Amino acid sequence: MEVKGEIYRVSGPVVTAIGLQAKMYDLVKVGNEGLMGEVIQILGPKTIIQVYEETAGIKPGEPCVSTGSSLSVELGPGLLSSIYDGVQRPLHVLLEKMGSFIQRGVSADGLDHKKLWDFKPIVKKGDSVKGGDVIGVVQETVNIEHKIMVPPDISGTISDIKSGNFTVVDTICTLTDGTELQMMQRWPVRRPRPVKAKLTPTRPLVTGMRILDGLFPVAKGGTAAIPGPFGSGKTVTQQSLAKWSDTEIVVYIGCGERGNEMADVLSEFPELEDPQTGRPLMERTVLIANTSNMPVAAREASVYTGITIAEYYRDMGLDVSLMADSTSRWAEAMREISSRLEEMPGEEGYPAYLSARLAEFYERAGVAESLCGETGSITVIGAVSPPGGDFSEPVTQNTLRIVKVFWALDAKLSQRRHFPAINWLNSYSLYKDSLNDWFADNVAPDYVPLRERAMEMLQTESELQEIVQLVGSDALPDDQQLLLEITRMLREIFLQQNAFHPVDAYSPFDQQYKILKAIMKWGDAAMDALKSGVPVTEIIKLESKNVLAKVKYEEKFDESMNAVLAQMDKEFASLRGR
């Protein structure tokens, strides 16, 4: 039911209306052009609305109309391969309607209401169904079978069910009480979709990035943050995760970042192959583009839209990864709206409820048993852009309280052209211990001890670097000079990775293990040679060390690795034979 009021005051994206009988978070059409807005505060007769479109030119006295429903997204077949703005308007539809520049007050359906999908029922007349039950399937892409579920708040007995080609708005099932079900369902973005139970994450998200998988793994259903200063590689890391992580669905939210970065994703993803299925990456991806020049209020909507779409696919029993780049821009939008509302500012001007909003978002991640009995997961990876790389600022600190994995990007590493520029001394993962059994069973029994040894060596190196800067490496004992050489190999061969190299961009677990084991084998053999009296200068000159550095770029990895290991054995045998 539509309720009319009128505009009383306009302050940037915040509009005050009077005479509008609306509820909190109701969707409102603002002004003569019908701009999309959402009720965020009610003060007696005044209703405060945040508007998701540019408010220039609207004035007091213009009408405000409440739609009576909250901001919702359309969920159903056709989400994959789509690119939306922050409020689920398909950008290709907006392009057809008005060209390259988006005008205001234009609405578009989130899903294509005319496209036909082949619906195959898996229930029959007379069956009882409840919220979350699967009534049929649609082949959405070659690899994704889309399960059509009963909306969570509906239950009953089936009186009629159809089979064949239908659009998402056609009635495919009728219950005895007259309720009609379509392939599409609408869901309010601020309300988490219900689940039977939340479960403990026990499987790692395989990213193909050696430093993440090897040293700081995130579990499927986990939460991770990538904070870092400008130019340290947040977006490239996020895009690498979106390209190569082993989840069935990827939701990528460009929240307040540069438009060119979204353009990169759009140009690259259709050409790249998913390493798990061999299909184009775009077939498993939903993109939400809310760039820095779009209205700030829509940044909040884009984050909630993305997580709601992710929850929908999780309910089908799929593993979903969600990349939000960057949550700092969302926090800045909250700060702007909060100041327009004249609320009491918290630290650095951010609203006092900043941590509550961030927690609300990250807590929607996790492994869950859905209402239909399937187990799915949402892994949320949020980039944070602290001004000047200051990790003590409120957004980073509040994020760190919530997430369990911290990948700290370091400007000094990026200046040295060490990418990914993740500082191995500042980063951590709280999922390590719970994933150790998986690594022992699926990678190698000695993988975890190898990883711990590598971390100890890297920490010892950082302590030795202080002495080296004072007196030089030649003043160190021979065993410590050799340790510095082994850790240099760890950094340059194992931790460094080229995100733009056709082979090195994605490193499977067995390759990661073999590279790490080869470096450790070289280090152990070098230490044995040193103890038997071989000078450290002779050991450092060995050619196998340089050949090992090139193995990660080889397409025939196993052949190259076996050749290097044979060369290594030969060189150390000749050293000992002198």
From Swiss-Prot:
Membrane topology category: Peripheral membrane protein
Residues that bind ATP: G228, P229, F230, G231, S232, G233, K234, T235
Catalytic activity: ATP + H2O + 4 H(+)(in) = ADP + phosphate + 5 H(+)(out)
Spans traversing the lipid bilayer: none
CDD domains: ATP-synt_V_A-type_alpha_C, ATP-synt_V_A-type_alpha_N, V_A-ATPase_A
GO biological process, one term: proton motive force-driven plasma membrane ATP synthesis
Locations listed in the record: Cell membrane
Gene Ontology MF, one: proton-transporting ATP synthase activity, rotational mechanism
Annotated family: Belongs to the ATPase alpha/beta chains family.
Function: Produces ATP from ADP in the presence of a proton gradient across the membrane. The archaeal alpha chain is a catalytic subunit. Component of the A-type ATP synthase that produces ATP from ADP in the presence of a proton gradient across the membrane. The A chain is the catalytic subunit.
Record's subunit section: Has multiple subunits with at least A(3), B(3), C, D, E, F, H, I and proteolipid K(x).
Stated name of the protein: A-type ATP synthase subunit A
Source organism per UniProt: Methanosarcina barkeri
Taxonomic placement: Archaea, Methanobacteriati, Methanobacteriota, Stenosarchaea group, Methanomicrobia
